[in-house]
Amino acid sequence: TDASDALTEAGFSPTRFAYPYGEYDLALTEIIRSLGLQGFGQQSGAIGPMSNPALLPRYPLAGVYVGESAFRDKLRSLALPIKHPDIDPLVSENLKPALLLDFVNPNVNTSRLTCYGPGGVMQISEEARGRVSITPASELPIGRSRYNCTLPKGNRYHWFSQLWMRKKTDGSWYQEP
């Protein structure tokens, strides 16, 4: 890429990429992976051994997200121990997409798993041992949305977030505020 070549010629060797507005699709994550870069979205969560290096989470630490208690919780969080799903976040027909999570340990107790998204608390259904389906209470709004899931572990939390993007009904992209 021209930008990468220009940085290399200037003596920089980039190793990380931040997705603008945290937006990505699977084709873009594959490009980031093929370039040997770590990719960072804007989905919340901790990085763990099963994290996708082309789509790593990062926490917001500004505005309403910067309080001391929230900061401490985020620093102490753990990655949700799941096999990370390869999901294209662009929603087109199904405006209430289900998120399937497969836990690394099928014996994990998912009864304390809590997920939030558009419309508040989400419905969690056990599909099989160690596999849950999460569905929103309402359709995703136009723009960016996230499903955020936490599972307590002592005084800490396992955390995972999934981005979704929905275009306008005419197929055009939403405008930034």
PLM regions and their residue ranges:
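Catalytic domains of cell-wall/extracellular-matrix polysaccharide-remodeling enzymes
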Residues: T1-G63
